[in-house]
Amino acid sequence: MNYEGHLKGHRGWVTSLACPQQAGSYIKVVSTSRDGTAISWKANPDRHSVDSDYGLPSHRLEGHTGFVSCVSLAHATDYALTASWDRSIRMWDLRNGQCQRKFLKHTKDVLAVAFSPDDRLIVSAGRDNVIRVWNVAGECMHEFLRDGHEDWVSSICFSPSLEHPIVVSGSWDNTIKVWNVNGGKCERTLKGHSNYVSTVTVSPDGSLCASGGKDGAALLWDLSTGEQLFKINVESPINQIAFSPNRFWMCVATERSLSVYDLESKAVIAELTPDGAKPSECISIAWSADGNTLYSGHKDNLIRVWSISDAE
């Protein structure tokens, strides 16, 4: 993979990244930061080298009064959700950068938020240990309380299935839980981590779940059975994991490294470091919809951009 350049505009750690799923979107990526803002980024038409900015801010989304911890993009519309330590979720129109709606019910910092695959539901979680399901009008429809997590819920995502909607959550209680959205029932609890879980993600086909956390282990699970398929020890606390949308690859961001693994061989196929520099810790990652570009967010306030070469 090749280093293409950076995006510069945040004044704090880049905490979360998300890429549009619509083909041909002029927005390349949306980022959130500890500076209390989110930014939607467009291509830089005047870029001539990796030393110039890879992209330019399209809109800066301002309004939160605390760190912004997570962003999720609608699959078929130009809307984004942001979660914040100010205990709120906001919905934004990316066409004009305006806040359209606030979601207020969490009693502590909100750490994670996600759109459902059909964009009709929203799920959120945070330091009050409660997972909440909302409609897009801002009404809280369900709270997952029975068999819930016993500590902060740090990460949450939907499976891509519309027929059997599932939510997966990761927590500081060292577990992952799989939830039926319609009934709010915990279908299974996945145990395998020896310390808190910081990230969970579901594969594009909905068959696999990957989790990572403080113990430095990336675990791969069969989502339908809850079976742990294998473990990759990266020997450093894991900040985020992301499946490639079109290759059997998994990117893992840790305190020490940013690596891409081939899931068949379980081998590292790329260690991502810009030429001549050792970047600061990577805490967020996102693949473009076509799988040809990877964005990484860092503690030095920069977003770095990587491309896949033709040989890969």
From Swiss-Prot:
The entry's keywords: Repeat, Ribonucleoprotein, Ribosomal protein, WD repeat
Residues in coiled coil? none
Q: Which SUPFAM superfamilies match?
A: WD40 repeat-like
WD repeats: from-to residues = 9-42, 63-93, 105-135, 148-180, 192-222, 233-262, 279-307
| InterPro entries reported for this sequence | G-protein_beta_WD-40_rep (IPR020472), RACK1-like (IPR045223), WD40/YVTN_repeat-like_dom_sf (IPR015943), WD40_repeat_CS (IPR019775), WD40_repeat_dom_sf (IPR036322), WD40_rpt (IPR001680)
- Tell me any Pfam family this protein matches: WD40
The GO terms this record gives for MF are: ribosome binding; translation regulator activity
What PROSITE patterns is this protein classified in?
WD_REPEATS_1, WD_REPEATS_2, WD_REPEATS_REGION
Instruction: One GO cellular component term, please give it.
Output: ribonucleoprotein complex
The record's section on CDD domains has: WD40
Similarity comment: family membership: Belongs to the WD repeat G protein beta family. Ribosomal protein RACK1 subfamily.
Instruction: Provide the protein name.
Output: Small ribosomal subunit protein RACK1
In its UniProt entry, the species of origin is given as Leishmania infantum
